[in-house]
């Protein structure tokens, strides 16, 4: 628990440091708060396959994961932003759910056993993003980098016990802010690369009663597409292309 708290504080440190500095220059004027959600497409990289059975003839058993386009998941989060000129620091803590499946094929002398195993992994994640945006009045396109710590939430699915609890990812994001005067929309996409194997080496065979496979060493990567609604405590400079004066 202490290690997890230390990791969370490490992720929050840049934001906390910036917030302390910003108190002298109008902290609330640099704050945006909102909420968002979106879809993700999980992409599995099989680092090393494992099997309960050993084929003495030398034939390799089939282990294949579902294609990225089929692995549709979702995420819901609170979004907190601090901005200074063109630099934006973003936190998006929330629940991130990933879906994918594994196809196993084992050839016995009398029959071939095929098995499709679905997975649902739900994480509480704290992504930290650093963005650089270009002010084009109503639209403010940006690009940046992201680093996230995630903790796997409990599940009744036996196969989920074969995964470690902690997960780190890094990646790149791009998108645009849309200034709608009273609210700001944030539309973005990002690719998140798993930084380590997420399979528990000690529990890879605990896939559930009757299962004929062991858990492979895998990386959990993914593409995320999100839409957020933000509320700024600072009066927006650009409302529309046509202003009304009285």
Question: Can you say where each PLM-predicted feature lies in the sequence?
Answer:
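Outer-membrane beta-barrel proteins
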Residues: 23-24, 41, 84-86, 130-136, ...
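Transmembrane beta-strands of outer-membrane beta-barrel proteins
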Residues: 31-35, 89-91, 126, 141-147, ...
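Flexible, solvent-exposed loop segments that connect beta-strands
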Residues: 45-67, 98-121, 151-166, 198-217, ...
């Amino acid at each position: 628990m202490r290690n997890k708290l230390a990791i969370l504080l490490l992720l929050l440190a840049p934001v906390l440091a910036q917030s302390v500095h910003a108190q002298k220059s109008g902290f609330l004027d640099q704050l945006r708060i909102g909420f968002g959600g979106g879809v993700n497409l999980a992409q599995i990289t099989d680092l090393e396959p494992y099997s309960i059975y050993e084929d003495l003839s030398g034939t390799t058993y089939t282990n294949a994961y579902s294609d990225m386009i089929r692995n549709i998941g979702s995420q819901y989060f609170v979004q907190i932003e601090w901005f200074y000129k063109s630099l934006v620091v973003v936190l998006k803590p929330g629940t991130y759910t990933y879906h994918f499946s594994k196809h196993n094929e084992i050839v016995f002398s009398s029959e071939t056993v095929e098995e499709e195993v679905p997975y649902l992994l739900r994480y509480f994640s704290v992504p930290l993003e650093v963005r650089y945006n270009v002010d084009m009045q109503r639209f403010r396109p940006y690009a940046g980098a992201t680093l996230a710590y995630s903790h796997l939430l409990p599940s009744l699915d036996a196969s989920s016990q074969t995964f470690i609890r902690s997960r780190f990812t890094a990646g790149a994001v791009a998108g645009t802010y849309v200034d709608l005067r009273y609210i700001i929309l944030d539309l973005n996409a990002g690719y998140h690369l798993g930084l380590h194997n997420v399979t528990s080496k000690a529990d890879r065979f605990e896939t559930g009663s009757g299962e004929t496979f062991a858990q492979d060493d895998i990386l959990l990567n993914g593409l995320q597409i999100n839409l957020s609604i933000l509320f700024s405590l600072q009066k927006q400079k650009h409302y529309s292309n046509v202003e009304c004066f009285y």
